[in-house]
Regions:
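A structural signal for short, well-ordered beta-strand segments
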Residues: 7, 83-85
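Compact, glycine-rich, soluble single-domain proteins
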Residues: 30-32, 37-81
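Beta-strand/loop substructures that line and gate deep hydrophobic ligand-binding cavities in soluble
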Residues: 87-111
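Well-ordered alpha/beta subsegment
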Residues: 107-133
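Short Gly/charged-rich anion-binding patches and loops
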Residues: 18-19, 36, 73, 121, ...
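Short, intrinsically disordered, mixed-charge
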Residues: 22-26, 76, 128-131
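Terminal, regulation- and interaction-focused segments at domain boundaries
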Residues: 1-28
Length: 133
C-alpha cells in the first residue's frame, strides 16, 4: 500500500523547508508540530547516528476547518492527526525530498460516513501544496 505522496526538488534543504511552509500556508494548513529528527537523534543517540539520517524534518500540518469537520464526524480521528509532511535531504547533490501522508490511508480506519470526503479535500490541498514546489 502506498501511503505517501512524494516529490523531489532541486533546491537546498533549508530553502525547501521554507517553500513547504509557504505552500502549506497557501492551502490553509498551519504547522502544529515540528520534529527535527537529526537534532533529536544527535541529542538522544549519537552524532554518528544523526549524520547517518541527515537532515530530516517532520512537520505536523493541520487545516483547522478540515480538522474540525473530521473530529466532529469521528472524535477518534484525532489519533491520526495532524497530517505529517516530511522534508529530508535527497540522495543526489542538491536534492530534497518532500513527502506528505495520503489522508485516504488514514481514514480507512474510520467507518464514519463523511470522513472520506474530508480526507479527499485534505488530499487535494496537500497535493496542491506539493505540486507548487
Amino acid at each position: 500500500m502506498n501511503y505517501a505522496h512524494t516529490v523531489t526538488v532541486q533546491t537546498p534543504f533549508d530553502e525547501t523547508v521554507q517553500m513547504v511552509r509557504d505552500a502549506l500556508t497557501t492551502q490553509g494548513f498551519g504547522i502544529l508540530t515540528e520534529i527535527d529528527v537529526r537534532a533529536t537523534f544527535a541529542a538522544k543517540l549519537s552524532p554518528e547516528k544523526a549524520d547517518a539520517v541527515g537532515d530530516y524534518l517532520i512537520l505536523g500540518a493541520c487545516n483547522p476547518p478540515l480538522a474540525h469537520r473530521a473530529i466532529t464526524t469521528d472524535p477518534d480521528i484525532g489519533l491520526l492527526l495532524p497530517c505529517n509532511v516530511v522534508v529530508r535531504r535527497g540522495p543526489g547533490a542538491g536534492e530534497t525530498v518532500v513527502q506528505a501522508i495520503d489522508p485516504a490511508t488514514m481514514v480507512q480506519l474510520s467507518d464514519q460516513p463523511g470522513i472520506k470526503d474530508i480526507a479527499n479535500e485534505a488530499n487535494t490541498r496537500l497535493l496542491a501544496a506539493l505540486g507548487s514546489l
